[in-house]
Amino acid sequence: MTDGVDTDEALMLRFAGGDVQAFEELYRRHELRVWRYLQRNLDNRATTDELMQEVWFAVARAARGYRPIARFTTWLLTLAHNRLVDTLRATRHHERLPTVADGSDGLSLVEQLAADSQTEPLERAQSQQHAAALLAAIEQLPPEQRQAFLLHAEGELTLAEIAQVTSTSFETAKSRLRYARSKLRRLLREYA
């Protein structure tokens, strides 16, 4: 505990001991992060919602055997990533181009970009246009690069954690993130 707030790992251990409120707190803390990661890699909200349920059921099933070897976030996003990959393989959606204007509530990147102390309507509108361009550019990334980028940007994972989540080497994760950033820079330069 730090400053009276349980770490995610401590909450998971409490949940393993039967504390349902600890699970509810973990869900509250990580629901949007996991949902956004899945939604940005899938075609529709229904599939995302279904996978969300599967991920959190998996968390509940694995609670008794949970060992805080890695950060909880890394472990959780590994569960989400594995279910995502299984779904993509089963449905052959490797070339997915998601819809930005799907009315989703999980536009964290847009919110962060648009909310950067923009108070003037013109500045806010321009910022929202830039954010929409970023999301459109993210959609154009190959699946492996998009996943690496989103795990870093949304999941706040390190390269080592991205490698762990995606079951790749550190160098592969590093390359995917580097190529993703390079392509995003190129695509966004074309936008400007």
Which stretches of residues belong to each language-model region?
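Sigma70-family region 2
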Residues: 16-17, 40-45, 54-71, 90-92
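Amphipathic, Lys/Arg- and hydrophobic-enriched alpha-helical face
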Residues: 27-45, 62, 138, 183, ...
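Short, charged helix-capping/linker segments at alpha-helix termini
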Residues: 2-3, 16-25, 35-54, 170, ...
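Helix-turn-helix DNA-binding module
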Residues: 132-172
